[in-house]
């Protein structure tokens, strides 16, 4: 299900629908605030939360990959703990890409497990304990910002600069899980991801933020594939599939068809056969995202190309300083 357009109007000019739903949004915000009062588990190692205020995709997975790699470069064994959205296993269980499928552990943990130890746990505190017992020197808590079950030592809120915080209202009147002021009041850093023009608009729309802001962009990982003039049928089931389609066009690919699927939508045999037939009729190559690729049926894994992206931060200084304060530095 795609988010409604009225979620992303200017905050100063809310739509009629947003105004009508505002009481429900206030009730949602109040429920979140009550939930956040609960006591959390204090881990024995630093816990870094990568979260967002918006419902849906903002770039948390590329951020988690970047932080895993940065901590690894510092000699820190960081483990990811995720709820495993879309998977059926309750955990805690360490994700094994050779054994697990997305239907069991979720697509994001399965992708993240290629970059470092990843755990799935419905009970995040239990997942943190399991990771600690397995030797984690730091925990990356994936999408747990509104979950109070684990105490966070560093919270990084990620936002897509192209859409910002939408109309600034809470679900269902807008895209927010909690009000901007309250959410950023608990955060340590804000990371806005997007190209220069999107960053400029975000800064203009949200000029007075109570938290230091980092900026970055998603850059295509060069894998030797020449996308120039490549005829493709692209499909994506992520938070904002149009970002993926735009990245392909920026690489020079010719999108003969772009199919936006629901976020985390299962990629069953019937759907993939339909897309394959359409691609053959168009003389096009099937292309998807890394996150979607882990949900592909085995029979299609050699038939579909991916366009990997990685987060490039403009300046790591603030994050490196935060890691230093937490004692996350190479020793010996």
From Swiss-Prot:
One of its GO terms (biological process) is lipid A biosynthetic process. ATP binds at residues 54-61. Its EC number is 2.7.1.130. One of its GO terms (cellular component) is plasma membrane. It catalyses: a lipid A disaccharide + ATP = a lipid IVA + ADP + H(+). InterPro entries: LpxK (IPR003758), P-loop_NTPase (IPR027417). The keyword Lipid metabolism applies. Keywords: ATP-binding, Kinase, Lipid A biosynthesis, Lipid biosynthesis, Lipid metabolism, Nucleotide-binding, Transferase. Pathway: Glycolipid biosynthesis; lipid IV(A) biosynthesis; lipid IV(A) from (3R)-3-hydroxytetradecanoyl-[acyl-carrier-protein] and UDP-N-acetyl-alpha-D-glucosamine: step 6/6. Belongs to the LpxK family. PANTHER family: TETRAACYLDISACCHARIDE 4'-KINASE, TETRAACYLDISACCHARIDE 4'-KINASE, MITOCHONDRIAL-RELATED. This is Tetraacyldisaccharide 4'-kinase. The lineage of its organism: Bacteria, Pseudomonadati, Pseudomonadota, Alphaproteobacteria, Rhodobacterales.
